[in-house]
């Protein structure tokens, strides 16, 4: 899992991995990159991983995340979306179709949601199959994002296979000039 660091107005916020604490913590940066202060706690008594904060072109704010709803701590199978109504995360409206995805091959986030060069919204997701975490990545194009509807299509897959030296891969982040991927190689 990854900490989601993002700008929110003039603030820099971070959502670190806190699934074991059964809550989601939002931290505010006091002095980048080393000084942070707890700003808000949401989703108390729930186990979440890989939360993404995203602002669409219309200014709507969204949280995308993966929640475990069973005793086995499965965070791979379901994607949930919430609309963030205010600037303090006090009011979160659940998407009407939550969970919007139920499928371990595409549900779990694998990095920040971003706009590609064509202006399309892209959501990296993990391929978790064959009882293998990090089997591969998808790049999904979000084609519909409203409080009532959500649709995405896979446009690219990067999978562990015989022809690749990859043993595992589960994170993709698009920077301003670089792409960052974590991977485990076979030697």
Predicted feature locations:
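Carbohydrate-active catalytic/glycan-binding domains of CAZyme proteins
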Residues: 1-187
